[in-house]
């Protein structure tokens, strides 16, 4: 609500027009607290002429605040007396009502204002392309050769990528930001080794979009793997499978973050992905945890029985790598094997 907005007892057209014409002086005076004043029809003040048509004798004003900020002004009028007595008597009730109004509407106004700022910020990121695609190698654990790369997004202001994408989704710009990031990643990936596949993070909403998404991927001749995290909800598995099938044989599917929660198990069973990516929570401290090792052995058995391949994520130590090799996990990814870097530095990332 703009400073100076009037909430009146009755929504007469003159008062509605007045609410749009109140001077900045009211907002300045509101900082001092509630007040009552007789109405004076001052020549040369258009809003005075408007209120004079209503016939007030005095007005009472109460600031509406939220979080110690002025967000509006509540006004009542008196037409029953020539002096200020009647209006002055009503002032405590007006102040109480203004406090209640601030508590009721202030939080929503603050939320809307913040959402507006976030929307503008995300729009600015998209229009300025204020992000950079980086690529992390996916490595064969036996032989240490990079066979694929996952495209990730880094923002030029250093913002956390997950937070930015979540904010974009919250203000209705999730698909726009996601599409812009994918376009940048596909363009940059053209200089990667031709034999390497490319993993792209894509939301179910974008994949199910159909033709727009197929057009987006259509310019790439590289083998693509679409990753969907276990944290997202797939509302319609039938529609998702149909959308994936329409992308053709050169586009496969991976379930990301397997082991981080229950949703990944249903994703795996319903979608039969080509790859299952083991979450860092299964890999961390693996060398000293029999339960984690048993879980990975079970997933390895499932992968072999269903024809998918495991990728262990978040490999950070030699001990973790050694156990994963011993457990015959075929593929891995993590800082030990290569950090996410711009495309020009990918040849130097694999240990």
Regions found by a protein language model. Give the residues of each.
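Regulatory sensory and allosteric helical modules in signal-transduction proteins
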Residues: 3-52
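EAL-family c-di-GMP phosphodiesterase catalytic domain
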Residues: 5, 204, 223, 227-235, ...
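A short, aliphatic-rich beta-strand micro-motif
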Residues: 57-65, 134-135
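Sensory-domain boundary capping and coupling elements
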Residues: 64-79
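Signal-transmission/dimerization alpha-helices at domain junctions
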Residues: 67, 93-112, 167-171
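Regulatory loop-to-helix N-cap segments in sensory/regulatory domains
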Residues: 77-94, 158-159, 285
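Active-site core of bacterial EAL-family cyclic-dinucleotide phosphodiesterase domains
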Residues: 115-167, 333, 338-342
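Catalytic core of bacterial c-di-GMP phosphodiesterases, primarily the EAL and HD-GYP domains
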Residues: 174-242, 314
């Amino acid at each position: 609500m703009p400073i100076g907005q009037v909430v009146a007892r009755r929504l007469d057209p003159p008062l509605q027009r007045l609410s749009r014409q109140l001077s900045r002086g009211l907002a300045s005076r509101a900082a001092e607290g509630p007040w009552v004043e007789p109405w004076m029809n001052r020549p040369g003040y258009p809003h005075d002429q408007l209120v004079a048509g209503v016939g007030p004798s005095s007005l009472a004003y109460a600031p509406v605040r939220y979080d110690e900020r002025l967000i509006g002004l509540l006004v009542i009028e008196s037409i029953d007396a020539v002096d200020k007595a009647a209006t002055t008597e009503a002032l405590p009730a007006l102040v109480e009502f203004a406090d209640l109004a601030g508590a009721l509407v202030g939080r929503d106004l603050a939320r809307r204002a913040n959402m507006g700022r976030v929307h503008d910020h995300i729009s600015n990121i998209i229009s300025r392309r204020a992000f950079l695609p980086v690529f992390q190698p996916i490595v064969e654990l036996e032989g240490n050769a990079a066979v694929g790369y996952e495209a990730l997004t880094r923002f030029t202001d250093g913002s956390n990528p997950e937070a930015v994408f979540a904010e974009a989704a919250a203000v209705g710009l999730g698909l726009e930001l996601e599409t812009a990031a994918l376009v940048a990643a596909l363009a940059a990936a053209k200089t990667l080794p031709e034999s390497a596949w490319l993993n792209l993070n894509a939301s179910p909403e974008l994949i199910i979009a159909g033709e727009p998404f197929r057009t987006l991927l259509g310019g790439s001749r590289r083998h693509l793997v679409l990753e969907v995290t276990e944290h997202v909800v797939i509302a319609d598995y039938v529609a998702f499978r149909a959308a994936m099938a329409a992308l053709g044989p050169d586009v496969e599917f991976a379930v990301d973050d397997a082991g981080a929660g229950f949703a990944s198990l249903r994703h795996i069973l319903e979608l039969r992905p080509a790859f299952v990516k083991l979450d860092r929570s299964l890999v961390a401290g693996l060398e000293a945890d029999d339960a984690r090792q048993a879980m990975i052995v079970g997933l390895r058995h499932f992968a072999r029985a269903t024809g998918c391949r495991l990728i262990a994520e978040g490999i950070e130590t030699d001990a973790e790598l050694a156990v994963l090799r011993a457990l015959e996990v075929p593929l891995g990814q993590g800082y030990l094997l290569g950090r996410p870097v711009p495309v020009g530095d990918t040849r130097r990332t694999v240990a």
